[in-house]
Amino acid sequence: VFDFNGDLVLATDWLMDQQEVIERSESKKKAPWSGFWYTNVGDDGTRSWEDMRKYGFLAAGGGSFFSKRLDQLNIGDPIFAYQKSMGYVGYGIITQTKIQAKDFEVDETPLFELPLEEDNIKHDCDDPELAEYVVGVDWKKTFPISEAKKFIGAFANQNIVCKLRDPATLEFLKTTFSV
């Protein structure tokens, strides 16, 4: 509410400097996509980040709502991996498109035959709706969850996969992961 020539006026922008109004509206536009993907690790008792690091994959499952997000990733795509509430833990390149976890192989050995820290990734493996799915990843640089990297204001959300656009986060990640 403003007093303008003796009248009380309710306004938001019209008394502001018009250049400031333009700058505010431009700041709400999305930044262009960087070409890097944000991915969520989901180390939560179903899947293990240590297994993902060791055997070269990223997993999602528990329903097609979650696993279908992996369809966005193609061979050659660069990804940054994030663990909820902890920070960024990895940078890698997609080497294999989505496949059911029970069919994923590491050097011709089925994933389910390897010593896993979290066997629960095998849950519902005969149910295509609920099973875990993976994409192959050549991890270029990773950190244990206890050493996850973050800063105040770093981009993070609950999506399994999404386009990474935030300039400050990208700068931080490129430096941290030597990209």
Indicate where each model-derived feature is located.
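Contiguous surface segments at macromolecular interaction interfaces
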Residues: 1-39, 43-44, 62-65, 103-179
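Short, flexible loop/turn elements at secondary-structure junctions
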Residues: 43, 83, 96-98, 141
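Short, basic/aromatic beta-hairpin or loop at an interaction surface
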Residues: 44-60
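Short, well-ordered loop/turn sites that connect or cap secondary structure elements
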Residues: 73-74
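Short, charged beta-turn/beta-strand-edge "cap" motif at the junction between a beta-strand
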Residues: 82-88
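Short beta-strand-centered aromatic/proline hotspots
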Residues: 88-98
